[in-house]
Amino acid sequence: MPSVQIRSSPSHSQPAMTVTDLKQRVIACLNRLSDRDTLALAAAELDSIALNLSPETFSLFINCLQSTDSSAKSPVRKHCVSLLSVLSRSHGDSLAPHLSKMVSTVLRRLRDPDSSVRAACVAASVDMTTNITGQPFSILFGPMIETVIHDCDPNAQISAAMCLAAAVDAADEPDVEQLQKALPKIGKLLKSEGFKAKAELLGAIGTVIGAVGGRNSEKAVLDWLLPNVSEFLSSDDWRARKAAAEAMARVAMVEEELAPLYKKTCLGILESRRFDKVKLVRETMNRTLGLWKQLEGDSTEVSESSSSSKSASSGLSATSGKRSNTLKGKDRNLNTPLSSKSNDVEPLDRGDTPKDVEQEAVVSKEKRNRSTLGAKRVLFPAKMHKVKENGSNKSQVVQSSDEESPKTDSGSSSSSQAKSNAEELSLIRHQITQIEKQQSSLLDLFQKFMESSHNGMQSLERRVRGLETSFSVISTDLLVSRSITQNGNHKRNACRQN
């Protein structure tokens, strides 16, 4: 019986000892993270502990991570958040009862000034969203929205907006109603001077628009959203310009019914900003511009096609008017030249009179004067050649046809001039693009040169410090050896004197 009691008593006390040992082990590993020499071993041990936890020890482990002081070193703060990702990936929905505590642990690190800690918060938000699906999405989404809206710390604003965008983008089935309610709230922050993380907020807005996916969208939301977002296309911050272009691209992709209503305005804005000086922004602008051009219902294209059809129809009516006088034109500008043509041609059929000859001379003189124009030579070279070679009757007929359609000639010359202007603009744009590519390559080379020179300076400084250290050690050794030899000499001299 005593042996049974001895065996049974440790079995009852084993779980308590295991929990105590686990807590001490975790705290010891967290302390070892502060030392650069033991950082890798401590991180590996903590990852192993997180992988092998039981559901009874989840709360204890998360409490140890949450109790880490903000004054700890950056590797400690970063790895505490990274362990939440390890837990989420390895245990999944078993952590659903502890999700709110994990979210609060992430929220405590949003104010961290270290960007690596904020990046770990974003990764943890994604892992919790994708792997812990047993709880509503609002447990993670709600606190992030509140932090974005109410927190005045710039680091917290940046981190919360990034976590919000990453979580919404990673969620399989986000709560669309909550996203629609939150969109006007976070959209108002674009006009707030107290909110500094405008680029990250624009990214979050674009992600929310993509998650809603055009479901139950309201025109009133886009009426204020698109103008506010498009204002940041001319921002001084290139990240804000890029995020604004991405948000407008999301609108073009998901809002198939409402986006065409804003196509003309958005195309004009994007066309004016497509030649950005930053390569990433320029590429994003061009992609967004292509998406908006693919939308249907552009009033600009309709007006252009209608105007071109009108000009073509006017040209056809003028040509038919030359061949037949039976056409009843609808344009008043074409009726007058047709009547003048009939009046000029009838006397020629009956016989030339002196008055008609004078009119013919005046007409042919005007024709010769107008033939010297550059636009006329370019547009109608064959006709002018025929007029010069043929007789006076042919020149009269050509002159009457020219008088029939002065607007057709001017329209043709203006269209030719517009075409040449378009070709010149395309050539200028091509040259500007080449110059921008050369500038970007030069900037890349300059950055690489600066990085290499910086690395060289750092290595040189390390070598100089090493030389100084070795020199100080050598000088110290020399002083010690000299003092020893001097003391030995004094002792020898004293012994000799005695």
Curated annotation (Swiss-Prot):
UniProt biased composition (Polar residues): 390-400
GO CC field: microtubule
Keyword Phosphoprotein: yes
HEAT repeats: 56-93, 97-134, 136-173, 177-214, 219-257
Phosphoserine modified-residue sites: S426
GO molecular-function terms, A-Z: microtubule binding
Keyword terms, alphabetized: Phosphoprotein, Repeat
Composition skew (Basic and acidic residues), residue ranges: 343-366
Pfam families: TOR1L1_N
Domain of life: Eukaryota
Name this protein carries in UniProt: TORTIFOLIA1-like protein 5
Phylogenetic placement of the source organism: Eukaryota, Viridiplantae, Streptophyta, Embryophyta, Tracheophyta
Protein's gene: TOR1L5
